[in-house]
């Protein structure tokens, strides 16, 4: 995933309006789980959402990428972070809110993997809690023929330029990111392939239901990709 580019992640995504996204997250939680005190962010990345939620909740994070997690731990040294796969991590306790944002669920490349991830997150969700999952694109919403546009960002001692080309193979979308990283005296180039599954709204809804959740889709969501808002369809027992 972001194995090569973790150091440039925050610079590249500085265009994201994290404060506005977190304000909407808070609003949803206040209306769906007003007594919520604890929050787990699955696929937490570098911890930017969590850094803005820490004043409202006792927070923890899970991510599969060691490089991103290292940055999150540096940003929030007093926050528990756990290295793990969203399908299989087990913290042995439940949270009032579970989030999985910025289309991270898309890295599940089969609907079976989506179900395993949702079921595992549901096992970490308190009986009266709320789960927020930001989806990736549907099969008819991903355009592999878009015109590549450069994303240019500045950081501490570097300038990074990223472009990508895209392809679709059945239900898999692949984005090959090309990076040019300029530092004093040199320019490096590398690529990363990001493969994400393409699933319909009906397929996602069925996966939530199979995981024991009642889910509704806010079509706009946090940044135009939609947002699934889910609750337990029946009481759940703590993960063991």
Place the predicted regions along the sequence by residue:
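Conserved class I S-adenosyl-L-methionine
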Residues: 1-43
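Class I SAM-dependent methyltransferase SAM/SAH-binding core
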Residues: 47-88
């Amino acid at each position: 995933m972001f194995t090569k580019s973790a150091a440039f992640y925050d610079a590249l995504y500085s265009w994201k309006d994290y404060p506005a996204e977190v304000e909407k997250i808070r609003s949803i939680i206040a209306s769906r789980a007003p007594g919520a005190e604890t929050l787990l962010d699955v696929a937490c990345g570098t911890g930017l959402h969590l850094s803005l939620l820490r004043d409202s909740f006792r927070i923890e994070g899970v991510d599969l990428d060691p490089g991103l997690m290292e940055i999150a731990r540096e940003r929030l040294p007093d926050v528990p972070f756990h290295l793990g796969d969203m399908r299989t991590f087990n913290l042995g306790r439940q949270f009032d809110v579970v989030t999985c944002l910025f289309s991270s669920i898309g890295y599940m490349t089969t609907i079976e993997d989506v179900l395993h991830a949702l079921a595992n997150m549901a096992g970490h969700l308190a009986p009266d809690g709320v789960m927020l999952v930001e989806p990736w694109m549907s099969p008819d919403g991903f355009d592999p023929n878009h015109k590549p546009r450069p994303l240019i960002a500045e950081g501490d001692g570097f300038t990074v330029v990223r472009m990508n080309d895209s392809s679709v193979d059945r239900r898999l979308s692949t984005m090959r990111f090309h990076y040019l990283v300029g530092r004093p005296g040199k320019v490096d180039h590398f690529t990363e392939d990001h493969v994400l599954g393409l699933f319909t709204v009906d397929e996602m809804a069925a996966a939530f239901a199979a995981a024991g959740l009642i889910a509704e889709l806010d079509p706009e969501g946090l940044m135009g990709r939609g947002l699934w808002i889910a609750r337990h369809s029946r009481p759940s027992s703590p993960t063991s």
